Each structure stands twice: as structure tokens, then as C-alpha cells.
């Protein structure tokens, strides 16, 4: 079995949970902070965000954007869009990564963060583990922009 099954937040397809319970604004903010810093170590990171129509998607979009920009990343919003479009835009427009805010087929009160790497594929488990470590650690563990 892969180590991913023992991860605290990320599962087989991103970070999902009931909005404001298992997945909250601080989780999204800190995920954004980490991704903005991680992809911005060698150049100014370019990260695109898409979302579904769930009410909580709007607050998660704002929290991610705040975290990303606090780390110096340029953020591009696709707003409401289908999940595959984020992968397509990341790949064709040379973004460092993309984030889709959606819990797919899960109930309306759930939501999720699906992080897509620069090749348009699911983010590597090693990076997801580092995001989890940062979420559970101090905010100042990485520098602000």
C-alpha cells in the first residue's frame, strides 16, 4: 500500500472534507501559502484556480488567493469551470500549478482542493506531504513575499 493512505488531509484525489469542518479557510490559506512559496523559489510563481458552484467554493478561492499572493505568487482565476479545464490551462499556458476547488460527486456540504502540477497531472504525493506538514506547523515556517 502507498503511504498516501496514511496522510492526514490529502487522499487519493486531493484534500476533501465537510466545508468549515474537515476543510476550512485556514487549511486553504496555508495550502496557498505553501504552494506560492514552493513554486516561487526560483521564479515568480504563476498559479491558476478554478472552482465549482458550491457556496463554499467562493470562500476557498479567496483564502487560496490570499495565501498564494502572501507568498508572492501571481494568481489567475478561472472562476466557475469544469475540473478538466484547470489541467488543460495549466499545461497549455505554462502555469506552475493549478488548483480546482470541488468535491466532485460528494454531497453539497463537502468541498475539496485538487492540486494539479505543471504537467496537468495530480500533484506528487511528496509535495502533498509537505503541504500537510506546513498546515500543521507555524505560519512563519516559510517567508512572506
Model-assigned labels for residue ranges:
Residues 12-14, 52, 80, 101-104, ...:
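Fold-independent oxyanion-binding glycine-rich loops
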Residues 26, 84, 125-129:
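Generic alpha-helical secondary structure signal
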Residues 13-15, 86, 131:
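Bulky hydrophobic/aromatic "packing anchor" residues in well-ordered structure
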Residues 36-39, 68, 72, 90, ...:
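Structural signal for hydrophobic packing residues in well-ordered secondary-structure cores
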Residues 2-66, 70-71:
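An N-terminal, well-structured beta->alpha segment
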Residues 3-5, 18, 113-145:
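Gly/Ser/Thr-enriched, mixed-charge loops and adjacent short helices
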Residues 46-110:
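N-terminal small/polar loop signature for handling phosphorylated ligands or for N-terminal nucleophile
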Amino acid at each position: 500500500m502507498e503511504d498516501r493512505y496514511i496522510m492526514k488531509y490529502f487522499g487519493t484525489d486531493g484534500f476533501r472534507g465537510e466545508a468549515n469542518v474537515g476543510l476550512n479557510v485556514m487549511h486553504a490559506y496555508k495550502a496557498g501559502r505553501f504552494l506560492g512559496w514552493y513554486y516561487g523559489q526560483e521564479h515568480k510563481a504563476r498559479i491558476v484556480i478554478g472552482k465549482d458552484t458550491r457556496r463554499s467554493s467562493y470562500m476557498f478561492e479567496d483564502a487560496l488567493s490570499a495565501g498564494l499572493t502572501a507568498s508572492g505568487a501571481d494568481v489567475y482565476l478561472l472562476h466557475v469551470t469544469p475540473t478538466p479545464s484547470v489541467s488543460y490551462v495549466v499545461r497549455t499556458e505554462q502555469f506552475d500549478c493549478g488548483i480546482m476547488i470541488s468535491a466532485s460527486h460528494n454531497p453539497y456540504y463537502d468541498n475539496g482542493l485538487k492540486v494539479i502540477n505543471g504537467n496537468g497531472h495530480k500533484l506528487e504525493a511528496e509535495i502533498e506531504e509537505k503541504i500537510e506538514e506546513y498546515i500543521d506547523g507555524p505560519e512563519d515556517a516559510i517567508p512572506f513575499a
